[in-house]
């Protein structure tokens, strides 16, 4: 059976810590979508690890780690991540169906961002997915056969010829790209496998599989705050499509949310706090992007969005992250509905334009940092947790009270 860990906000919820905390109980840990635009930060034995493509199970020697087919892969960046770890043989596997991000994709991404102003990381994620959908991309499996790779490269060069000047690719682009593959492909090829068959077989044998998503539900290309979204499907349903596991294989869906809200880049954010309180949350929560170092926009917990995300993903349990960031705040707000043009909205709309938050205020607490038992939390903190559970209709099974792995309350 497989369990899914999915972000149910705008990403950066703390999925990495949760996967790292529970990975020891699984045989496989699988990253199922996105690219190196995402980032997991894990603190292990006092050392901070920033992972962008590698599954979070790499810190456990017994885990097999898979990058599955719906992930788009920068082979240069993956090589750098691989070099930071030892003994990855028979522990890391990359789907032969996953698509390769080319330097051209990053150039195109930056070019388009100038006019679209979506707030992308400009790492080529969207353009790589564009080529995938246009059936013109290069897949990881193509790297295993020089003849096939050459065919794919020639087709790529022909397709981009009209855009070379616009995307500032340079006169030596063809030579440089071939050299790029010669440099990085040999380091990657030993890890490329038919991971779909691997996972189907593992599931049939009853091995335990953990599927981890990137970004968050509200950035989903179909169900998120379009057009201010990522280029992949970020919900739990994507885990099945990417891995080849059918929906019957899914057991638990663990939704990850912070005790407040954050968002990186542009796009609507009804519960954003632009007062000094927002700055306080950003500073105390160290809310700066793992990948881009951009400051995250911060605000209060949005239960309208949270209920929507829980429903989309079929969440069976929740993990509440960064409760300690709210320590010492006298009055804590929670968005319980929106107001738009005089109308109260309790369902998440397809367009958040003109939506203003309707808040309910709770009394704060002094300290939750480092607490590892529910009974040791102050009454006001416990009341906050119970309110979230009641409103969302999903049990909170885990509460994080610091970045450290051990500072976790299990319920």
Swiss-Prot record:
Enzyme Commission designation: 6.3.4.4
Presence of keyword Hydrolase: no
Subunit: Homodimer.
GO cellular component, one term: cytoplasm
Enzyme class: ligase
Transmembrane domains' residue ranges: none
Cofactor stoichiometry and binding remark: Binds 1 Mg(2+) ion per subunit.
Gene Ontology terms, MF aspect: adenylosuccinate synthase activity; GTP binding; magnesium ion binding
Catalytic residues, chain numbering: 12, 40
Family: Belongs to the adenylosuccinate synthetase family.
Reactions it catalyzes: IMP + L-aspartate + GTP = N(6)-(1,2-dicarboxyethyl)-AMP + GDP + phosphate + 2 H(+)
Gene designation per UniProt: purA
GO BP terms: 'de novo' AMP biosynthetic process; IMP metabolic process
Residues at which GTP binds: 11-17, 39-41, 296, 322-324, 400-402
SUPFAM superfamilies in the record: P-loop containing nucleoside triphosphate hydrolases (SSF52540)
Alphabetical UniProt keywords: Cytoplasm, GTP-binding, Ligase, Magnesium, Metal-binding, Nucleotide-binding, Purine biosynthesis
Protein name (record): Adenylosuccinate synthetase
Organism of origin: Helicobacter pylori (strain Shi470)
InterPro entries: Adenylosuccin_syn_GTP-bd, Adenylosuccin_syn_Lys_AS, Adenylosuccinate_synth_dom1, Adenylosuccinate_synth_dom2, Adenylosuccinate_synth_dom3, Adenylosuccinate_synthetase, P-loop_NTPase
Positions annotated to bind substrate: 290-296
Family matches, as Pfam families: Adenylsucc_synt (PF00709)
Subcellular location: Cytoplasm
CDD domains: AdSS
Job of this protein: Plays an important role in the de novo pathway of purine nucleotide biosynthesis. Catalyzes the first committed step in the biosynthesis of AMP from IMP.
Named cofactor requirement(s): Mg(2+)
């Amino acid at each position: 059976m497989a369990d899914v860990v999915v972000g149910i906000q705008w990403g950066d919820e703390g999925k990495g810590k949760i996967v790292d905390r529970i990975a020891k109980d699984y045989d496989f840990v699988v990253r199922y979508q996105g690219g190196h635009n995402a980032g997991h930060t894990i603190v292990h034995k006092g050392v901070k690890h920033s992972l962008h493509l590698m599954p979070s199970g790499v810190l456990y020697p017994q885990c097999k780690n898979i990058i599955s087919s719906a992930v788009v892969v920068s082979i240069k960046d993956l090589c750098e991540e691989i070099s930071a770890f030892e003994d990855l043989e028979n522990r890391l596997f990359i789907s032969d169906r996953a698509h390769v991000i080319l330097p051209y994709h990053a150039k195109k991404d930056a070019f388009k961002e100038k006019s679209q102003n979506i707030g992308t990381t400009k790492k080529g994620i969207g353009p790589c997915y564009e080529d995938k959908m246009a059936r013109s991309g290069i897949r990881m499996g193509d790297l295993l056969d020089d003849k096939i790779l050459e065919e794919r490269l020639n087709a790529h060069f022909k397709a981009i010829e009209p855009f070379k000047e616009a995307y500032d690719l340079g006169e030596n682009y063809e030579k440089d790209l071939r050299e790029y593959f010669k440099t990085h492909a040999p380091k990657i090829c030993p890890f490329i496998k038919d991971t779909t068959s691997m996972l189907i077989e593992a599931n049939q044998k009853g091995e335990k599989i953990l599927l981890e998503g990137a970004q968050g539900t509200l950035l989903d290309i179909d169900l998120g705050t379009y057009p201010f979204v990522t280029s992949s499907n970020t919900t739990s349903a994507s885990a099945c499509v990417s891995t080849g596991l059918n929906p019957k294989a899914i057991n638990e869906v663990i939704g990850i949310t912070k005790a407040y809200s954050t968002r990186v880049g542009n796009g609507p954010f009804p519960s954003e706090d632009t007062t000094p309180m927002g700055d306080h949350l950003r500073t105390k929560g160290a809310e700066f992007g793992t990948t881009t170092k951009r400051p995250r926009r911060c605000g209060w917990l949005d239960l309208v969005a949270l209920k929507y995300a829980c429903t989309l993903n079929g969440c069976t349990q929740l993990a509440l992250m960064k409760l300690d960031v709210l320590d010492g705040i006298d009055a804590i707000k929670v968005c319980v509905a929106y107001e738009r043009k005089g109308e109260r909205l309790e369902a998440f709309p397809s367009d958040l334009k003109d939506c203003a938050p309707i808040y309910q205020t709770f009394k704060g607490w002094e300290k939750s940092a480092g607490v590892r038992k529910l009974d040791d939390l102050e009454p006001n903190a416990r009341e906050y947790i119970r309110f979230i559970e009641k409103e969302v209709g999903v049990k909170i099974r885990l509460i994080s009270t610091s970045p450290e792995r051990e500072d976790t309350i299990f319920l």
